[in-house]
């Protein structure tokens, strides 16, 4: 089980990303638009730099929904390999069978 502080910090980052998503998208489109003058583009870059650091989506860490484990995360299921193995062995995931050959 991951530390609760790490899990909560990641939840706060997710909330910040959602809050600033529209503003960030607008500033990025302005900054990358080559038809605009260089001064406007530079000003958009400065405003983008003023946004909170944790408002950047790359700062979010994928974590297991059950344990909070940050590694071996399966995106399709939203859980880690440890939780997948545990749920699979208990028959809680439909269609998942132990392989044998």
Swiss-Prot record:
GO terms for biological process: translation. PROSITE patterns: RIBOSOMAL_S14 (PS00527). Keywords: Ribonucleoprotein, Ribosomal protein, RNA-binding, rRNA-binding. One of its GO terms (cellular component) is small ribosomal subunit. The keyword Electron transport does not apply. GO terms for molecular function: rRNA binding; structural constituent of ribosome. InterPro entries: Ribosomal_uS14, Ribosomal_uS14_bac/plastid, Ribosomal_uS14_CS. It holds the Pfam family Ribosomal_S14. It comes from the Bacteria. HAMAP family: Ribosomal_uS14_1 (MF_00537). Part of the 30S ribosomal subunit. Contacts proteins S3 and S10. Binds 16S rRNA, required for the assembly of 30S particles and may also be responsible for determining the conformation of the 16S rRNA at the A site. Belongs to the universal ribosomal protein uS14 family. This is Small ribosomal subunit protein uS14. The gene is rpsN.
């Amino acid at each position: 089980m991951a530390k609760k502080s790490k899990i909560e910090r990641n939840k706060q980052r997710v909330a910040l990303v959602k809050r600033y998503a529209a503003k960030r998208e607008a500033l990025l489109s302005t900054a990358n638009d080559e038809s605009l003058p260089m001064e406007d583009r530079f000003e958009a870059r400065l405003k983008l730099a003023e946004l909170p650091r944790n408002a950047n989506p790359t700062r979010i860490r994928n974590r297991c929904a059950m344990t909070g484990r940050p590694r071996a995360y399966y995106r399709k299921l939203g859980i880690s390999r440890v939780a997948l193995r545990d749920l699979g062995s208990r028959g809680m995931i439909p269609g998942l069978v132990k392989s044998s050959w």
